[in-house]
Amino acid sequence: MGKAQIIQHQARRILSQSNRNCLFRRSYETLPAANQTLPSRIKTDINQKASIIPLLEQWRKQGYEVNPSHLRGLIKNLSDCKNFTTALEASKWMFKHSVFDNFPEDCAAQLHLVNTVLGLEEAEKMFKNIPEKMRDYSVLLSSYTKPVRTVDKAEATFKKMRELGFLLKPYLFNSMICLYGQLQRLDMVEKLLYKLKKNNMEVGSLKVNNVSRVYANINAMEKFKTWVSKEGIELERDTIVAMAKAYHRAGSIEKAR
């Protein structure tokens, strides 16, 4: 099993943990009644988008050990609720105090939060400080493929991932396909789709957002349609509808049907 597969497997294992259990476990046998309400106070502070760091510090100083799965679950749930700032606070606290051994996916989760809250420049700074064996390039690639202005960095990151043997999932190719679609780079879209097929990866249905932008003109669309048919790639219904509309706008009524 390659490094990227190990990371992804570990991420799924950790993030599958339920957040319905207790967030912390007591290192002693008894729990003082005065502390029984602390979990509810944490929940209240989260709902009010207040900093939870003082409560985490208090809980830890009173002799409670952090449950890794549940703290990770807390961070994930905060992110799912788009409470990214509080999630980043909890993630940084987790790293600062080394409350348990961190995994590459912990770094990836924090990198995503840094990019979301503080921006791409800060995310790049953080990435440079992550030990090589703990780096997850997929987060960085995703960040680079969103703004067109970072195409050079996206291509460099994609190349690095290929050299390291990390390009094991179709979604990594899809990120670049989407980027090249925005740039009207039909040649690169075809090249990446060919690599997916060559590597025996499941292409599946192509999302309309990933390919519709390459239809700069009817000739390009005809070429793409022929190539897709030859390779046996299934187009999503929305993509077929988008192509039909493009034919209709160009006056090719028969082809639009």
From Swiss-Prot:
Similarity comment: family membership: Belongs to the PPR family. P subfamily.
UniProt keyword list: Repeat
Pfam families the UniProt entry points to: PPR
InterPro entries: Pentatricopeptide_rpt, TPR-like_helical_dom_sf
The protein's name: Putative pentatricopeptide repeat-containing protein At1g43010
PPR repeat ranges, renumbered to this chain: 133-168, 169-203
One MF term in the entry's GO annotations: mRNA binding
Organism: Arabidopsis thaliana (Mouse-ear cress)
